[in-house]
């Protein structure tokens, strides 16, 4: 039996982080967590691109534009923060952002991780940004690196 499993190693891996600016203090923490994890995993500054968009809804469109430029990245980490309000706006945005990212990942056969916090309130969002527990941006980067490594192994088969 052959087992293929990726490793969270960033050496020679080109990665992009697409981070929403809305809910900036929390979103910035996700982007920082992803960036720090990339460098801790052996990545070089020349191999990392950070793109900031106004809000989470703009993430899939920015990713699609980046991917239309060719094979520039081996993985993408999507970071954003959506906090539930009193209307259904939150559900519409969360559903469409998640579906858009998933669709692009499959369409381009590229690891695109969903490090978008969907929280009922600000306190819960901060917890998911690493205040009490793991930083979703950091875990998204680890997953992206593992998947990029796995895809490389699969291509060599």
UniProtKB/Swiss-Prot annotation:
Reaction equations catalysed: (2S)-2-hydroxy-3-oxobutyl phosphate + 5-amino-6-(D-ribitylamino)uracil = 6,7-dimethyl-8-(1-D-ribityl)lumazine + phosphate + 2 H2O + H(+)
Keywords: Riboflavin biosynthesis, Transferase
Residue pairs linked by disulfide bridges in the UniProt entry: none
Keyword Transferase in annotation: yes
Active-site residue numbers: 89
InterPro entries, sorted: LS, LS/RS, LS/RS_sf
One of the record's GO molecular function terms: 6,7-dimethyl-8-ribityllumazine synthase activity
Gene Ontology terms: biological process: riboflavin biosynthetic process
Binding site for (2S)-2-hydroxy-3-oxobutyl phosphate: 86-87, 128
GO cellular component, one term: cytosol
Enzyme Commission designation: 2.5.1.78
Binding site for 5-amino-6-(D-ribitylamino)uracil: 22, 56-58, 81-83, 114
Pathways per UniProt: Cofactor biosynthesis; riboflavin biosynthesis; riboflavin from 2-hydroxy-3-oxobutyl phosphate and 5-amino-6-(D-ribitylamino)uracil: step 1/2
Role summary: Catalyzes the formation of 6,7-dimethyl-8-ribityllumazine by condensation of 5-amino-6-(D-ribitylamino)uracil with 3,4-dihydroxy-2-butanone 4-phosphate. This is the penultimate step in the biosynthesis of riboflavin.
Alphabetical list of PANTHER family matching this protein: 6,7-DIMETHYL-8-RIBITYLLUMAZINE SYNTHASE, 6,7-DIMETHYL-8-RIBITYLLUMAZINE SYNTHASE DMRL SYNTHASE LUMAZINE SYNTHASE
Homology family: Belongs to the DMRL synthase family.
Name of the protein in its database record: 6,7-dimethyl-8-ribityllumazine synthase
Natural source organism: Chlamydia muridarum (strain MoPn / Nigg)
Gene name of the record: ribH
């Amino acid at each position: 039996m052959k087992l293929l499993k990726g490793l969270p190693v960033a050496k020679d891996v080109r990665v992009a982080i697409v981070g929403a600016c809305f809910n900036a203090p929390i979103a910035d923490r996700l982007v920082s967590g992803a960036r720090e994890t990339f460098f801790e995993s052996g990545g070089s500054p020349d191999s990392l691109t950070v793109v900031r968009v106004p809000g989470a809804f703009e993430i899939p469109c920015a990713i699609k534009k980046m991917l239309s430029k060719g094979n520039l990245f081996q993985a993408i980490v999507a970071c954003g923060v959506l906090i539930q309000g009193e209307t259904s706006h939150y559900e519409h945005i969360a559903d469409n952002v998640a579906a858009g990212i998933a669709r692009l990942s499959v369409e381009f056969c590229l690891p695109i991780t969903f490090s978008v916090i969907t929280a009922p309130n600000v306190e819960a969002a901060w917890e998911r940004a690493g205040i009490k527990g793991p930083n979703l941006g950091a875990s998204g980067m680890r997953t992206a690196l593992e998947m990029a490594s796995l895809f490389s192994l699969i291509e060599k088969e």
